[in-house]
Swiss-Prot record:
Residues 1-43 form the signal peptide. The keyword Secreted applies. It comes from Mycobacterium tuberculosis (strain ATCC 25618 / H37Rv). It comes from the Bacteria. This is Phosphatidylinositol-3-phosphatase. Its main location: secreted. Its EC number is 3.1.3.64, 3.1.3.2. GO terms for cellular component: cytoplasm; cytosol; extracellular region; host cell cytoplasmic vesicle; peptidoglycan-based cell wall. It is found in: Secreted; Host cytoplasmic vesicle, Host phagosome. The C-terminus of SapM is required for interaction with RAB7 and SapM-mediated autophagy block. Monomer. SapM interacts with host RAB7 via its C-terminus. Phosphatase activity is inhibited in vitro by low concentrations of several heavy metals (zinc chloride, sodium molybdate, magnesium chloride, and copper sulfate) and moderately high concentrations (>8 mM) of EDTA. The gene is sapM. GO terms for molecular function: acid phosphatase activity; phosphatase activity; phosphatidylinositol-3-phosphate phosphatase activity; phosphoenolpyruvate phosphatase activity; phosphoglycerate phosphatase activity; trehalose-phosphatase activity.
């Protein structure tokens, strides 16, 4: 169990309840960015095969701004009791291409946030899971309706929701965060879920303390449940605060995770490669050449 945070010591029943600059990118154009890194089949490895994985993506903070920061006690408790990847880096700036890298193995040449992006039926983590008989769902805070493709709505931003860009991920699998299960229903979670807080709660517009409190309120129960239910929580960031170094926090917490600080260099492609390896999925995009993370797992 996580320690040192009041909310995590309570019973689960008391846990806190633009116009596109480069236009629509046709699937045929996007395919030209991935031609050199084809989808490659891979047998399931000896990595743990989790019943459920929840991936939370935060915004625009460097590792130095988060790890050791007293304004982020929940995240630092996850880091202290999980696998803290001390040399994790994003691919580029700004936000959107990093989300695409994490979800589909490629930035697709984006150099600015663009809406809409049309990824067509190019392979991605969601489509791979579905093709292999697993399940996927994306939970986005303030998404105005199931399957909505709007570019923005209040504090919701489509640029942070990569699965919406692909026709091989059914729109019914893009849902508001309000649909995220309560603790008693965690066994019904999809195989892999993405959780995207709104711009206030992902540290983009709001403070580190606000983002940490949101995670504590909404994901602490899942984090504790995951430890004893063959499940995993991954918390990462899209990019840092705009520096050329682009070093980001990334933490794995849950069952089979051996706590510690790990110093191998990783990127969003390595995280994607790890998830694909866990479920025996084809490696897609630049995940093809990104080794999976193998040293953080124990009994």
């Amino acid at each position: 169990m996580l320690r040192g945070i009041q909310a995590l010591s309570r019973p689960l029943t008391r846990v806190y309840r633009a116009l596109a600059v480069i236009g629509v990118l046709a699937a045929s154009l996007l395919a030209s960015w991935v031609g050199a890194v084809p989808q490659v089949g891979l047998a399931a490895s000896a990595l743990p095969t989790f019943a459920h994985v929840v991936i939370v993506v935060e915004e625009n903070r460097s590792q130095a701004a988060i790890i050791g920061n007293k304004s982020a006690p929940f995240i630092n408790s996850l880091a202290a009791n999980g696998a803290m990847m001390a040399q994790a880096f994003a691919e580029t700036h700004p936000s959107e291409p990093n989300y695409l890298a994490l979800f589909a193995g490629n930035t697709f040449g984006l150099t600015k946030n663009t809406c809409p992006v049309n990824g067509g039926a190019l392979p991605n983590l969601g489509s791979e899971l579905l093709s292999a008989g697993y399940t996927f769902m994306g939970f986005a805070e303030d998404l105005p309706a199931v399957g909505s493709t709007v570019c923005s709505a209040g504090k919701y931003a489509r640029k942070h929701v990569p699965w919406v860009n692909f026709s091989n991920v059914p729109t019914t699998l893009s849902v508001p965060f309000s649909a995220f299960p309560k603790p008693q229903n965690y066994p019904g979670l999809p195989t892999v879920s993405f959780v995207i807080p709104n711009a206030d709660n992902d540290m983009h517009d709001g403070s580190i303390a606000q983002g940490d409190a949101w995670l504590n309120r909404h994901l602490s129960a899942y984090a504790n449940w995951a430890k004893t239910n063959n499940s995993l929580l991954v918390v990462t960031w899209d990019e840092d605060d705009g520096s050329s170094r682009n070093q980001i926090p990334t933490v794995f917490y849950g069952a089979h995770v051996r706590p510690g600080t790990y110093n191998e260099t990783i990127s969003h492609y390595n995280v994607l490669s790890t998830l694909e390896q866990i479920y025996g999925l084809p490696k897609t995009g630049y995940a093809t050449n990104a080794p999976p993370i193998t040293d953080i797992w124990g009994d």
